[in-house]
Regions:
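Short loop/turn motifs that connect adjacent beta-strands in outer-membrane beta-barrel proteins
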Residues: 30-44, 57-59, 92-102, 115, ...
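Outer membrane beta-barrel
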Residues: 98-255, 460, 489-491, 504-505, ...
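Outer-membrane beta-barrel "beta-signal"
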Residues: 518, 554-570
Length: 570
């Protein structure tokens, strides 16, 4: 209940005052036109966002007592401010003679709620296996969660004709989203086309995948062969991995994971010596990653048909651990190479209902795999790979005016995954009926879906419902966005399938005001729920969820929080 939450932490008053001042005059705000007329048209756009958030749930002791979840769970208490973040993005675009140009954008952020101190369970035993032995975050973790910046888009383009055929060329760092999927980033045609920012996804449930894409260096060409047929091709010059909240932060799903932590923490006790963490064994930047697409819209189809072929290195890592011969080891990330995808999409509109379908077949893609190969002195560089079929269907419906709302939208999407075969390293596949699927309480027994083991078939759904009320005040539109992602049946076989495991609930509910179509103010609640394993008492540590905690990132189960966001552009 909100009424019993003691709110700690305050808004930076200068930032809030500035945001309110901008809101007051935002009706006249325009992008800065640096040069227009003649051959060049150059524009500078700036977006500023302020986000505040507070933890609303009490700590679940079975999470706080878990050696792999304690640091993230003890970073903030109920009522604490978990984010107090100012972020800005600047975009510079220039167009020469309306057919040639460039785009450059960058982002900078600072979160005043975070310091660099690592916190954990006050039980003295937990201080012996910190994922940051120095007691402070690594530079990598501080960059993404305290203060940092990055270049986003950086590309040039040229539009021309070859004979009578329009040709569009682009080179540099940018994003391109193929297919029709809205929400499911691990099972869509665009999987691994670009890395996905799951830091943003966890803090903004209901975001569309294309909004979460991170740019990647590439060259791309598209041509309109006929009014009904176009073709595109892209070749990548850079590899980038999916971005997740780092271990030991509020929404970090596992204390020792990803590129931030420097120690394997409690794994040291299992491996008989110190365990390092944070290293990534990435594919080469230029590794023959490419894609081709044909878009066809014949009159008889009543819509658009897409055909796709892609070869890529998976951007979703395996979390893996090496056991050294002399004791100790290493926790790291490694990636599947040269996966292939064949896909077909179709989209069609029926009045106010827009529908989309995707069917894709992925070969030698990364599957849910064991954390360790169990072999002393043998490096673990590749988990299980296999062939999977993914089907996505969705619809976007524009709400008609009713006594309850003026307009709005409803988006619904279904994702189905079928494992066709395990192609390599079947002994490492963490799937029901395979050797690496073990019971959470007794590792001598075979495991099940409840233990996080993948199943042959899996189904998940996602919804976004946002009714709108127009002109509730001068220049103000109001909406109430609500989202839900739910794991209906089974655990997907692909790596990170646990995010959509059976029983998963990722949800948000809120209210948003749009002021003169330039500024938004949103207040929402975000929650997460995965099925947990049985509780077990660990001597010296207390009672916690057994094994890895359940069938997904259960460390987030007690991380429900209220979020206030103010965003404007000029």
């Amino acid at each position: 209940m909100m009424s019993d939450i003691q709110i700690r932490g305050s808004l930076p008053l200068t930032v809030l005052a500035s945001a309110l001042a901008v809101m007051g005059g935002v009706g006249q705000a325009q992008a800065a036109n640096l040069k227009s007329g003649g051959d060049w048209d150059v524009n500078l756009d700036t977006t500023v966002q302020y986000t505040a958030g507070w933890r609303t749930q009490e700590r679940d002791d079975a999470i706080g007592n878990h050696p792999f979840f304690a640091e993230g769970d003890y970073k903030f208490d109920k009522g604490d401010m978990v984010t107090n973040r100012v972020q800005g993005m600047v975009e510079l675009q220039g167009v020469y003679q309306k057919n040639t140009g460039f785009r450059l954008s960058g982002s900078y952020w600072k979160d005043f709620a975070y310091d660099d101190k690592v916190r954990t369970n006050p039980n003295p035993a937990f201080s012996t296996f910190l994922s940051y032995p120095s007691g402070v975050y690594s530079p990598e973790t501080k960059k993404w969660h305290l203060q940092g910046g990055e270049i986003l888009d950086a590309f040039v383009f040229h539009n021309t004709k070859v004979g009578e055929t329009p040709l569009y060329l682009k080179a540099g760092r940018f994003t391109q989203h193929w297919g029709n999927a809205f929400f499911f980033g691990f099972s869509n045609i665009a999987y691994s086309q670009h890395p996905v920012d799951y830091v943003k996804a966890f803090t903004q449930p209901g975001s569309e995948v294309k909004e979460l894409f991170l740019p990647r260096a590439q060259v791309m060409a598209s041509a309109d062969l006929t009014p009904e047929l176009s073709v595109s091709a892209q070749y990548f010059l850079e590899f980038r991995a999916n971005r997740f909240p780092q271990g030991g932060t509020y929404l970090g799903p596992f204390d020792i994971l990803y590129s931030g932590p420097t120690s394997g923490g409690a794994v040291a006790g299992l491996f008989g010596g110190p365990v390092s963490a944070g290293k990534s064994y990435k594919p080469k930047g230029i590794n023959n990653n490419f894609g081709v697409k044909a878009a066809w819209s014949p009159a008889w189809a009543g819509g658009d048909i897409g055909f796709y072929y892609r070869q890529f290195d998976d951007v979703q890592p395996w979390a893996a651990a090496d056991i050294y011969a002399g004791g100790g080891g290493e926790v790291h990330q490694t990636f599947a190479r040269k996966s292939k995808l064949f896909g077909v999409s179709y989209e069609r509109t029926f009045g106010t209902l827009s529908t989309g379908w995707e069917v894709s077949y992925r070969t030698d893609t990364a599957l849910n795999s064991a954390f360790s190969n169990g072999l002393v002195g043998v490096p673990y560089r590749e988990g299980a790979t296999g062939d999977i079929v993914n089907v996505i269907a969705n619809g976007l419906y524009t709400l008609p005016q009713t006594p309850l709302w003026d307009t709005g939208l409803l988006i619904a999407e279904m994702s189905y995954t079928h494992l066709n075969r395990v192609s390599r390293n079947a002994n490492l596949y963490n799937g029901v009926g395979y050797a690496s699927c073990r019971d959470s309480v007794n590792a001598a027994l075979p495991g099940a879906k409840a233990d996080g083991c993948a199943s042959k078939n899996a189904l998940a759904v996602a919804f976004l419902f946002e009714p709108q009320w127009l002109q509730v005040g001068p220049g103000i539109d109001l909406s109430a966005p609500m989202s839900l992602t739910y794991g209906v049946h089974g655990n997907p076989a692909y790596a990170a399938g646990s995010f959509y495991a059976q029983g998963t609930k990722i949800f948000s509910v809120g209210v948003k005001a749009t002021i003169r179509q330039k500024t938004t103010v949103a207040l929402q609640y975000n929650g997460y729920k995965w099925n947990t394993s049985p509780k077990a008492n660990v001597p010296g540590l207390g009672t916690s969820y057994a094994g890895f905690g359940g069938n997904g990132p259960v460390a987030l189960n007690d991380k429900g929080w209220v979020q206030l966001t103010v965003k404007t552009s000029f």
